[in-house]
C-alpha cells in the first residue's frame, strides 16, 4: 500500500536543491570558517554552471510543497496526515523555514563579495 503524499518529499527536494545551488559560493566560506583549507575548496566552483538548474529545481519543489501543504482541509480524506491540525501546522512551519533557507541560499552569491 502506498503512503499518502504530504509534501515532505517536495520540502526535502527544495532544501537539497537550494543547498546545491549555493555550494559554489557558500561552500568554500563555510569550510574556511570551520577551519578546513586547501586548494581543493576551489574545485567547488565547477558546480556554478549548474546553479540555474538547482535554483529551478528548488523553486519547483517549493511550489509543489506549497500546493500540497496549503490545500484546503476538505481536500484531505479523513484519517490522512493532512487532516490532523497539529501536523498541518508543523508542515507549514517547516515549509517556511525551508523557504527562508532557500532564499538565503539563492541570495548568498550576491552578498558573498561583502565577506571577502
Curated annotation (Swiss-Prot):
Its main location: membrane. Pfam families: MerT (PF02411). It is a multi-pass membrane protein. Keywords: Cell inner membrane, Cell membrane, Membrane, Mercuric resistance, Mercury, Metal-binding, Plasmid, Transmembrane, Transmembrane helix, Transport, Transposable element. The chain crosses the membrane at residues 16-36, 46-66, 94-114. The keyword Transport applies. Disruption phenotype: Mutation decreases resistance to mercury. InterPro entries: Transprt_MerT. It is found in: Cell inner membrane. It comes from Shigella flexneri. Belongs to the MerT family. GO terms for cellular component: plasma membrane. It comes from the Bacteria. The keyword Cell membrane applies. This is Mercuric transport protein MerT. Involved in mercury resistance. Probably transfers a mercuric ion from the periplasmic Hg(2+)-binding protein MerP to the cytoplasmic mercuric reductase MerA. GO terms for molecular function: mercury ion transmembrane transporter activity; metal ion binding. Hg(2+) binds at residues 24-25, 76, 82.
Amino acid at each position: 500500500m502506498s503512503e499518502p503524499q504530504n509534501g515532505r518529499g517536495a520540502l526535502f527536494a527544495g532544501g537539497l536543491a537550494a543547498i546545491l545551488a549555493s555550494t559554489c559560493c557558500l561552500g568554500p566560506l563555510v569550510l574556511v570558517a570551520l577551519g578546513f583549507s586547501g586548494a581543493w575548496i576551489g574545485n567547488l566552483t565547477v558546480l556554478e554552471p549548474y546553479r540555474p538548474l538547482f535554483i529551478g529545481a528548488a523553486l519547483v519543489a517549493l511550489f509543489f510543497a506549497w500546493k500540497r501543504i496549503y490545500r484546503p482541509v476538505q481536500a484531505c480524506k479523513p484519517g490522512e496526515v493532512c487532516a490532523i491540525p497539529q501536523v498541518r501546522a508543523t508542515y507549514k512551519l517547516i515549509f517556511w523555514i525551508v523557504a527562508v533557507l532557500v532564499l538565503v541560499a539563492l541570495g548568498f552569491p550576491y552578498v558573498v563579495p561583502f565577506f571577502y
